């Protein structure tokens, strides 16, 4: 799938090195085809890594995507240059009158706070509410999945006794739903979080369906009844080294973290991690883009304004 991005975005060179089809805006403008407009609200601290992870994950269909990165106005990121944010990101206020085919809201390292205590919570709430009328389908990742379930359906998160960190076995529950087409009966997904959601509360809500889960980490993919909201509690987009960097960070902070489960060869942090979730991640993002965005979004996004 060609991804339309700014020519100077740092991720562009890395994607081209990996043989990912990237199209600059000049070439895209000469094609007689409407690209899918995808907005990404990037709340992760390392913006550049997350940009690369998500663009890589979105690159495995023949669909043409036009990516818009969003940042919050209520919080200024400290792990990326101001010039990068000014050049490649928009504020919500700049795009709120537009419509998008898809929206991705990422995780964020604020899970131990109550939602209302998060600096940018009010802004995230505004974006989540806006998405119901301006976006065909929204994909919520990790913390964002918990935030979306809480805001839209009143389902609370809870703090776990021990952090979930590693690559965990999952299984599908509803084989007829498009979101899990191509999934193996057993598949693996990275998780890295200190909080979880109440599976029973989700099951009691008639608007929600758990379509995949893990015996160890709980609900993984949750859909609303229309497919306009997809909640993913793990990190299928993670790079092979993402959990390693988090583990090393926590060791340096003196947190005495457990070794990420099912991740390092022989569970030895001195050995290279094994990426066992690539095929699943490709299938999940392909299914969301194709069946929940492309197949149902109107050709003229602005027609119903």
Q: Where do the PLM segments sit?
A:
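Cysteine-nucleophile active-site neighborhood
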Residues: 105-174
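Amide-donor transfer/coupling interface in amidating biosynthetic enzymes
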Residues: 1-74, 88-95, 99, 126, ...
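Acidic/histidine-rich helix-loop elements
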Residues: 79-80
């Amino acid at each position: 799938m060609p991804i339309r991005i700014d020519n100077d975005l740092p991720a562009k060179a890395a994607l081209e090195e990996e043989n990912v089809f990237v199209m600059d805006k000049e070439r895209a403008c000469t094609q007689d085809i409407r690209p899918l407009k995808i907005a990404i609200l990037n709340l992760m601290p390392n913006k550049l890594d997350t940009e690369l992870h998500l663009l890589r994950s979105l690159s495995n269909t023949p669909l043409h995507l036009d990516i818009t990165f969003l940042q919050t106005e209520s919080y200024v990121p400290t792990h990326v240059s101001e010039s990068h944010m000014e050049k490649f990101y928009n504020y919500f206020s700049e795009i709120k009158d537009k419509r998008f085919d898809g929206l991705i809201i990422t995780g964020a390292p604020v899970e131990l706070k109550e939602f209302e205590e998060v600096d940018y919570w009010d802004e995230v709430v505004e974006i989540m509410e806006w998405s119901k009328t301006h976006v065909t389908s929204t994909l919520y990742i990790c913390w964002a999945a918990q935030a979306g379930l809480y805001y839209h359906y009143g389902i609370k998160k809870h703090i776990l006794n021990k952090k979930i960190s590693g690559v965990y076995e999952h299984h599908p529950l509803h084989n007829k739903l498009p979101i899990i087409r191509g999934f193996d009966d057993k598949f693996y997904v990275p998780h890295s979080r200190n909080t979880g959601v109440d599976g029973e509360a989700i099951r009691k809500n008639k608007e929600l369906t758990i379509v995949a889960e893990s015996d160890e980490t709980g609900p993984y993919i949750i859909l609303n009844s229309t497919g306009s909201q997809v909640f993913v509690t793990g990190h299928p987009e993670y790079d092979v080294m993402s959990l390693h960097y988090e583990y090393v960070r926590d060791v340096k902070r003196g947190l005495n973290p457990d070794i990420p489960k099912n991740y390092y060869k022989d569970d030895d942090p001195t050995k290279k991690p094994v990426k066992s979730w690539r095929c699943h991640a490709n299938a999940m993002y392909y299914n969301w883009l194709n069946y929940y965005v492309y197949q149902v979004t109107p050709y003229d996004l602005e027609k119903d304004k």
